[in-house]
């Protein structure tokens, strides 16, 4: 288990919590003095009222909640959003409304999930060429959208 320091910046803040024993992400709630309405095709930065101190070598990822995406077309445009170990400011959640109707966020609404993950730093080695693979440079849908016969 990893210890993460957390500071309540607003007395009304609801700290992140795992909803079930085996949940990968903690629910993150809005900390608002008044409701915020996100118009269709717009985004808004929603405060959480807390800041965290992650151990070196870890990050926190903010991810959309599936229920908000399914029922209201609400997502995070920079998903997963990264909170670096050296960031000490308030955690904010950028919500985007892909739906046709305005979406209102109230204090205490669960608006995102937070997953804490280990981060490995890499060192790039510049080379003249890369090794060959069967896939090569194929990307962006090069395998099609239909299931292959051996998968059916």
UniProtKB/Swiss-Prot annotation:
Single biological process term from Gene Ontology: dUTP catabolic process
Enzyme class, spelled out: hydrolase
Molecular function via GO: dUTP diphosphatase activity; magnesium ion binding
CDD domains: trimeric_dUTPase
Keyword Nucleus among record annotations: no
Gene3D superfamilies, per database record: 2.70.40.10
Family classification: Belongs to the dUTPase family.
Function comment: This enzyme is involved in nucleotide metabolism: it produces dUMP, the immediate precursor of thymidine nucleotides and it decreases the intracellular concentration of dUTP so that uracil cannot be incorporated into DNA.
Identification of the protein by name: Deoxyuridine 5'-triphosphate nucleotidohydrolase
Organism (species): Chlorobaculum tepidum (strain ATCC 49652 / DSM 12025 / NBRC 103806 / TLS) (Chlorobium tepidum)
Name of the coding gene: dut
